[in-house]
Structure formats: C-alpha cells, structure tokens
From Swiss-Prot:
Residues 571-594 are annotated as: Disordered. Keywords: Endoplasmic reticulum, Glycoprotein, Membrane, NADP, Oxidoreductase, Transmembrane, Transmembrane helix. Monacoline K acts as an inhibitor of HMG-CoA reductase involved in cholesterogenesis. Its hypocholesterolemic activity might be useful for lowering cholesterol levels in the blood and reduce artherosclerosis and coronary heart disease. Its EC number is 1.1.1.34. GO terms for molecular function: hydroxymethylglutaryl-CoA reductase (NADPH) activity. The gene is mokG. This is 3-hydroxy-3-methylglutaryl coenzyme A reductase mokG.
C-alpha cells in the first residue's frame, strides 16, 4: 500500500520538474543574448563584491602593518599551537588552550618557539650572530636547532629557531622586525601575515606565492602532500577527459570551455553566498578540497545533457531532410533547436536534477552535522556551488549550447539554405562583410573579457601585499612537530630532567623578504602594468570600456537574430541536381516535431466533429488521441475516412493515410504522460516507418503500428535438396548461424545433396466440449467414433472449404469433458483459420444430431496442441511431418568439417539422444533445430510462435560403409505459402527465391510441402555443422570471432 501511494507522487514530482525545466530552457533559448548578458553581469558583480569585501577587509583587519600602527603580536599568533608538558599530562606533549597557559598563575615556564625563514640567504648570513646586535639585553632568547626536511633544499631557505619566554615575545619580534644583511642598500624585513597595505608587482607577487607554497609544503605531512598531489593530478585528468568527451561530440574547445566557465561562475556565486552568510572559509582547505569536489561531482551531467541535445538535434535534422525541399523553409526549422533542447530535457532532465539533489543533500548533511569544523564549512560552500551549477547548466550553459547549435545549423548548407550567404546580414541598413563582422565581434568580446580581467587584477595588485585573507578566510593551524620538532625535543629533555611544568606555544614560521633601504623605485620607473591599472582607475578609462562592452552586446544582439531568421522571402534556390530520395535502410526515420498549434483544443475538437478533420495537423490529431477523442487503434480507419472525404486537390491515397496514422501514433505515444519517461523518445527514435506498405499490414498482420523492424537477412547455401539447388534465406541476429549452415550445405552437397520425405500432412484443432454427465460425454464419444457420426462431421467440415478435407478424428474424455482432435489438409495455407471454421460447422452439426445438451467450452482446448510442445504432436504429428537425410563422405568430414565420423556419432548419441533423455526433453533430441527453423520462418513470413512445435526434431547419425549418414525427423512442421505474414512484400520475395510463393496452380498444398522439405534440409545442414564444431572444439572460438564484434566507432 505504501509503495502504491508513493509511485504517483514521484511521477507527479518528475512531471512538475520536467515542465519547469521546459519553461526555463524555452525562455533562455528564445532570449540567448539576454541570458548571457544577465549571467555575465551578475557573475562580474558577485566576484567584484567578493574580492573587494575580502581583500579590503583583509587589508584593514588584524595584522595590518602601517607606519603609524603599533606592533601587533596577535597577528603572528594566528595559527599557532600551544602544548603542555608535566605530570598532569604524564610527561607527554598534550595540546592545550593558549588562554589556559596565559591565565594560569602556576605556570612558571611558558616558552614561545619562533622560526625565522630567510629565503635565498647568502652563506655569510647563515649564522645567528647577525641577530644578536639587534636584540636588547632584556630579551632572553636562546637559539635552538631548526627543523628541516626535503623542501628546505628546494626552497633555498635558511632558517633560525629561537626559544623565547612568552612574556618577552613582543619585544623579541619587534627587535627582529628588520635585520641587516650583507648588502648595504638592502635589509631583511618581516613579511607580515596579513600584508602591509602596499602595492606589489606581478612578478613579485608570483614569486611570493611560490615561496609561500614551498613554505607550506615544508611543514606539511608527506602523506597529505601526496594525497593533495594525486588530487590535482586527477583533477587535470578530469579536465582532459572533459575536453576529449566534448571533442567526440563535435566541439574542439568552446563547449568544454563553457562548462568550465559555468563551473567558475558557480564557485563565485557559492563563495558570495557563503561569505554573506558569515560562514568562515579556509583558503587552504579550498585549495585542498576543490579538486576532490570536482572529482566527486565531475562534468558528467553537462556531458550527458550535451549528448542528449545533440542526439535530438541530429534526429530532427534527419527528419527534416526526409521531407520535400519546400518543407525545409517552414516554421519547423525555427523550432528545431528549441525542440531539441526540450527532447533532451525529456530524456535526461529528471535524471540530472535527481543527481544534483542527491549531491546537494549529501553536502548539506555534512554542513549540518559538522557546522563548526572546516569540513562542515567546506560542505556548506560546496552545496551552494552544486546548486548554482545546476541552475547555470539549464540557463547559462543551455544558452551557449543553443547558440552553438544555431551557428552549426547556419554553417551547414545541407541543413538550411540561407538567403544571405552571398550578401551577408545587414547592420543599421548597411551590408557587412562576414570577415569584418567576425573581427568586430572578436574585438568587442575581447574588450569585455579584458575589462573584467584587469578589474580583477587591479584589486589583487592594488591591495594585496602577498597572499591575503580576511575574517572569512582564516589561516590553518600549524603542525608543531613539523615546524619545531628539534626545539620541542630540547625543551622536553630539560623539563623532564627538572620536573618542571612547561607550556610551549609554537608560532607559524615567520618569513623575511629582502627590501630596499630607501624607495625601491622612483616615480619615473613606475611599472607599465601599474600604469595601465592606474589608467583604468580613471573615470574616462572606465567609461570607454563600458561603452565598448555595451556596443559589443548590442551588436551581437542584433546580428545573431538576423542570421537566425533572415531567410529569403522568395522561392529557394534550385540545386544543380535534385538529391535522390533516401531509402529506409540508409537514413533512420526520425520524426520532425511540428510547431505548436495556434488553435485551442475546443476549436480542434469542433473541427473534428464537423467532419473537417482534413484541415487538422498531425500535432492536433495527436492531441485528440491523447484526450481520448480518437482511439489510438483506429487512427488508420479515421484517417482513411478523412482521405476519402477530402477534395480532389487535397486527396491522399490509402497508403499515405496509413503512413500518416503511424506518424501520429508515434507522436501520441511519445507524449503520453503516464509513460513519458520511457516512451518519450520514440517519436524521434531510429525506428523507421517510412517507405513501407501498411496496406498489407492493416487488418492482417499487426495493430497499433508505429513502424517496422529491419532484421538482418542472410543466405545459406546453395544446397541441393531433392536434386534442386536452393539458396536458403535466414533472418537472424545471431552471428555464425548463417555461416555454419552454409558450411553444412557445402558438406552435404559433396555427398549428392539432401533427400527429403513427407510422412504426413494434416493440421489439427481440438475443441473442448462439456456435457451434463460423464455418461453423456461417453455416449458422444461413441457417436463420434461410429461411422454415422464420423460421416456427419466429415460432411459438415468439408463443406466449409474446397481445400479442407477431414482426415481423422481422435477423441479423449476427462470426466464430463470431451476433446475431439480434428486433423485435416489445408492446401498451401498453414490452415489455422480454415480448420477453425470447419470445426465450428462440424460441432453445429453434432448438436443437431442428438446432442442439444452439448456445450462448446472452447474451440481450442489445447488438445491440438497449438504453440506448445506436446507428446501428441511428437507422436501423431501436426502440420507437415518431414524427414531429411544425407550421406557425407569421410574425406569431407575430415577436410570440411574438421573432425572424424566416430567422434560425430558418439557426440550425437551422448548429447542429442542420451543428454536430452536425461533432461526429460519432449521433442528436443537435437543440437539447435530451433535456430534454423526460426530464421527461415522470419525470412518467409511464417508464424514465429509455431516455432515451438515445428522445432521438435530428433537427429540421428550412423557410420555406414565408412561414410557418415545423418538424418533429422520433424513430425510437426507448420508452414504455409499463402496468408499471414507471407503477404508482406519482403517475405514474399524470399518465397519467390525458393519458388514456393502463393498457392500451387495444379497441386494444392505442393508449395507448402516443398517449403517444409526445405526447412528440414536447412535444419539438417545446421545440425551437421554445429555438431562438427562441438566435436572439434571450434564452437566457442567461432562465436567469439564472429558474434562478439566490438562496438563500431562513430568517428571515421
């Protein structure tokens, strides 16, 4: 009950989400330039706001150092770690809170471990002696052994470590703020954790960033570094896979770049919301977490959406190409791209949204359960990033994809003949050369990009004195044993020896930079880049850039619609030679979706009821089907009546009406709400429907037709059967089958061919009769088996057809039920309908001859037995009972079949006879007779379901006079050459190939009997070849070579 209640709700949610995506994507496709403009402006505003708020706050926050500001020790304590050692911690280092150490009056020993790093220091400077002169006597700093690792040599960094009483830390840091170097005009200066508010050059900023990276790497865990390195390596591989996937879809650069740009926008939006909510974001955690977030979320959803859109676009394009040339210039061309987007939404929209919801939910759980930890803070940011990525996928990226498809459609002459190919579009009433147009567009778009890049750079280099953070971007805590392991060991030994409670605060390493003693550069040597940025700061520079941006956007907004919809009002240009019509085998049959109807449903229904349905479009008729006004199964009848009632100028043939019915049914099926998630793609699928004679199908072979299935058809042989050579047609999707049968035919031909015998010919039908009592049923059985009753039933039966002649009656009783098995000839027809009509008349005659109390329970009581394996068919036969035999020379067995006679005989006995008996098989004493029977049945229009009893077969093999004798006995072969699927054109052609199509002109039933002999001979060839392959051990290798082909690549 619960599951039943949930399913409709899920379907409703899916329907609402899909409709919402339809509305959003439809709007952005109608206004692509506006969508790109709004998204770009919002993104630019957001990242400028984030940058300005972040870096200005950083510059004015704690730790800023100006000439007028006092020395701030707290800025150096950010990220420090305090440890305690004593009896309370069992003389082990224990992490503690700094407030406990500074507020506890019992603590007599509180040390600060300070590491000073001098990048690129000279050999003469590699001694602490040059610091002593700067230290006052009141500072009791003691040098200790600095801690080094692998990255020390890479960074070319010289470090000094000191143990300073915590109460004297401020005096020590102020004393070592500036340190003299071996160069008179330069000195070492502390690089403050949060900058000094001074602008720096681009090269210096990059250098500081590299040194900062090496500095962090030197004090990081090796395992952490390896994991982060693997993360970034995998990130690069993910980016490469994105570009490769988009390249396979036909875009070398722009679509992949658009996906990355959309992801960058999502990051900016997510960071803006996160900082606005007051959630602190760790910049180092960002650098560590973003690669793994990208690896987890990936680019699979944009790729899926792109693939679905391109697939739908290609299908619609193929559908338009199958129409006449005049149809290429109607409104369907305009709606091709939006319809492709909507089809992609139907196919992948809900699945993509579902994936996004799962990812957002998982990240939200991480943010809720661990809100105050770095992991929870990153989950909060990541959840917003994924949310904005989902929004941008169906807005910003969908717009770019729509524009890309429009450009591709305009550049493809096979898709649409543009009227302005030779003259170009017009701007403000003037013709524009396409080359100049491309150059102008490149300059304008480049101006927009340059404006944003320089605006971003101006914030970096105007404000940053290094790599900065603000209150929202806090530093990470240092690892004390990575930074000062040697110093901690020295303090541990001293404290343990003296038994003194000791606190140690390990500061993050303090880095020095080499600075000029005076002004580093004069006004006359101002960097060119800074001059450019200063120029951009002026009102005139900003005004010029904004003007160029507005003009670029206006130009694109004017050009793209002009190129999309500017077609010639006259007739289309005539091509040099008309293209030949596409055959159904060469072009898949995709259905172009018509433009939405402008008439309301009430108007459509009124026209239909007023017998004016000939004026309705396919889309409107499909809507009538969906609303239940036209039954789906009666579309052929409805459209046939519409065609016959139309005027002479609009009259269509019966075949055209039936083809249109199939097309409308496909549209109705694809739009059925209850199955749209599964059947929504049937309208534009590769299932063909054109160029088929549905007049032969209607009322004979199939109902609710939506197309036809092309099936591979092969020919085995030629094979000599009863002295006549035949090619045997086989329709199958199983590799090796036709090849194997051909090998069997070759082997049989060397022995003179196959010889067949027809042992019986009679179709059966077994009705079930009910009587008031078992005694009454027994009386009826005696009457049926008596000469009088037999004659009455025979006369009534034979009167129904000139071909039907009753042969035998087999009667069986079960309680009050009586089963009578009628067996009769049926000419060249398979005969099920013929015998059913005769049985019905015979039972009426029986009722009139003394059995008015008889009740016909069913006309087919499974005593036939039809489409079921049964012993009565195996023993008594049904249809044609055929035997086929052949003698294979021993030399052929060795050279052609690659085995020997004794092995074949033993295999047949052990497998086909004993093995089937052990399995309790009924008529299955063969290797694979059903394979051959079904393949020939499909090729010649037989009833596929009757393969069940027709495949009953026993294969025998003997060694006679040194040669192999093989025979197959098939007692219930049910075939016909008229009626059913034999009326179809393709199947009829295969009957012509065998010379057995239709009824025999002089000998009724001869064609059907000949077909049964051919089928039995084909089974004989298949059995011989397959058993030989099994005996030689070649079966698996043959199937792996011929039936396991790799998927073909679309790229040629």
């Amino acid at each position: 009950m619960a599951s039943a209640a949930v399913t409709p709700k899920l379907g409703w949610v899916q329907h609402q989400v899909t409709n919402g995506l339809h509305a959003v994507v439809g709007q952005v496709c109608r206004h692509p330039i506006h969508t790109l403009l709004v998204t770009a402006l919002i993104a630019a505003t957001t990242y400028l706001h984030v940058l300005e708020g972040t870096f200005r706050a950083a510059n004015l926050g704690p730790g800023s150092k100006t000439d007028a500001a006092p020395f701030d020790v707290q800025s150096f304590l950010w990220g420090s770690r305090s440890l305690r050692l004593g009896e309370t911690s069992s003389w082990r280092w224990q992490v503690g809170d700094l407030s406990e150490a500074t507020g506890d009056g019992q603590v007599n020993h509180h040390w600060a471990l300070v590491t000073l790093s001098f990048p690129g220091a000279s050999v003469d400077d590699r001694s602490p002696a040059f610091l002593w002169n700067a230290l006052p006597d009141s500072v009791g700093a003691e040098p200790i052994t600095p801690t080094s690792n692998f990255f020390t040599s890479i960074s070319n960094e010289f470090s000094l470590a000191f143990r300073v009483p915590y109460t004297q830390l401020s005096d020590f840091l102020e004393a070592v703020e500036f340190v003299a170097s071996d160069k008179e005009d330069r000195s070492w200066a502390i690089r403050f954790p949060h900058g000094e508010g001074k602008p720096i050059s681009l090269g210096r900023w990059l250098g500081n960033s590299w040194l900062s990276f090496l500095h962090r790497a030197k004090h990081a865990e090796t395992v952490d570094m390896a994991i982060i390195g693997l993360g970034y390596l995998a990130l690069n591989m993910t980016l490469v896979s994105l570009f490769r996937a988009m390249r396979q879809l036909g875009s070398r650069f722009w679509l992949a770049a658009s996906v990355l740009l959309s992801g960058a926008f999502a990051f900016v939006f997510g960071l803006g919301v996160t900082t606005a909510c007051g959630v602190p974001v760790d910049m180092l955690l960002l650098s560590e977490g973003i690669p793994f977030l990208v690896l987890t979320v990936g680019f699979e959803k944009p790729i899926r959406f792109t693939r679905a859109v391109l697939y739908a676009s290609n299908q619609l394009r193929r559908g338009l190409q199958q129409r006449d040339v005049a149809d290429k210039h109607d409104s369907r061309q305009r709606h091709m791209i939006p319809n492709a987007m909507l089809f992609a939404i139907n196919r992948e929209g809900w699945s993509i949204v579902q994936s996004y919801l799962l990812e957002i939910g998982a990240l939200a759980l991480g943010a809720v359960f661990r809100p105050r930890e770095r992991f929870g803070q990153f989950c909060f940011l990541a959840a917003w990033m994924v949310l904005f990525d989902a929004i941008l996928l169906f807005t910003f990226y969908a717009t770019i994809l729509c524009v890309k498809l429009e450009v591709t459609r305009m550049q493809n002459p096979g898709t649409l003949d543009l009227a302005d190919d030779q003259h170009g579009p017009r701007i403000f009433g003037y013709k524009v050369n396409p080359t100049s147009l491309a150059r102008w567009k490149l300059i304008m778009v480049g101006g927009f990009v340059l404006f944003n890049v320089l605006q971003l750079s101006s914030f970096f280099y105007r404000i940053m004195g290094g790599f900065m953070t603000n209150a929202a971007l806090t530093p990470t805590t240092v690892s004390p044993f990575k930074v000062a392991a040697n110093g901690l060991n020295d303090i541990y030994l001293a404290a343990r020896a003296g038994g003194v409670e000791t606190w140690v605060t390990v500061l993050p390493p303090i880095r020095y930079v080499m600075e000029a003693s005076g002004l580093e550069m004069s006004a006359g040597r101002r960097p060119v880049f800074d001059g450019v940025l200063a120029g951009l700061e002026s009102p005139l520079g900003r005004l010029c850039l904004m003007g160029a941006l507005v003009f670029s956007l206006y130009l694109n907004n004017h050009l793209i619609p002009a190129a999309r919809w500017h077609f010639s009002p006259g007739a289309p240009k005539e091509s040099a030679a008309p293209a030949p019509p596409s055959s159904p085998a060469s072009v898949p049959s995709a259905v172009p979706v018509p433009a939405p109807s402008s008439r309301s449903f009430e108007e459509i229904e009124a026209l239909f009821k007023a017998n004016q349905a000939e004026s309705l479009t396919d889309d409107e008729l499909a809507e009538l089907c969906l609303r239940g006004k036209i039954a789906g199964y009666s579309l052929e009848k409805t459209l046939e009546s519409i065609a016959s009632a139309g005027s002479s100028s609009t009259a269509t043939t019966r075949l055209e009406a039936f083809t249109r019915a199939v097309r409308i049914r496909r549209a109705a099926v694809s739009r059925t709400p209850s199955t749209r998630d599964l059947s929504g793609g049937i309208q534009e699928s590769l299932l063909p429907y054109r160029n088929y004679n549905y007049e032969l199908v209607h009322g004979a072979c199939c109902e609710n037709v939506i197309g036809y299935l092309p099936l591979p058809l092969g020919l085995a042989g030629p094979m000599v059967i009863d002295g006549q050579a035949y090619f045997i047609p086989m329709a199958t999707t199983e590799g090796v089958l036709v090849a194997s049968a051909s090998r069997g035919c070759k082997a049989i031909n060397t022995g003179g061919g196959a010889v067949t015998m027809l042992k019986g010919d009679g179709m059966t039908r077994g009705p079930c009769l009910g009587f008031p009592s078992a005694k009454r049923a027994a009386e009826a059985q005696r009457w049926v088996e008596s000469p009088v009753g037999h004659q009455v039933l025979t006369d009534a039966f034979n009167a129904t057809s000139r071909f039907a002649r009753l042969q035998t009656l087999t009667v069986a009783q079960a309680g009050t039920y009586l089963y009578i098995r009628f067996r009769t000839t049926t000419g060249d027809a398979m005969g099920m309908n013929m015998i059913s009509k005769g049985v019905e008349k015979a039972l009426q005659a029986m009722t009139a001859h003394g059995f008015p109390d008889m009740n016909t329970i069913t006309l087919s009581g499974n005593f036939c037995a039809d489409k079921k394996s049964a012993a009565i068919n195996w023993i008594g036969g049904r249809g044609k009972s055929v035997i086929a035999e052949a003698t294979i020379p021993a030399d052929t067995v060795r050279k052609v079949l690659k085995t020997d006679i004794d092995a074949l005989v033993e295999l047949n006995t052990a497998k086909n006879l004993v093995g089937s008996a052990m399995a309790g098989s009924m008529g299955g004493f063969n290797a694979h007779a059903s394979n051959l029977v079904q393949a020939v049945f499909l090729a010649t229009g037989q009833d596929p379901a009757q393969n069940v009893e027709s495949s009953s077969c026993i294969t025998t093999m003997k060694k006679i006079d040194g040669n192999l004798h093989i025979a197959v006995s098939m007692p219930s072969m049910e075939v016909g050459t008229i009626g059913g699927g034999t009326i179809l054109e393709a199947q009829g052609a295969m009957l012509d190939l065998l010379g057995v199509r239709g009824a025999h002109p002089t000998d009724p039933g001869a064609n059907a009997r000949r077909l049964a002999r051919i089928v039995a001979a084909a089974v004989l060839a298949g059995e011989l070849s397959t058993c030989s392959a099994l005996a030689a051990g070649h079966l698996v290798n043959a199937h792996m070579r011929h039936n396991r082909s790799a998927a073909s690549s679309e790229k040629k």
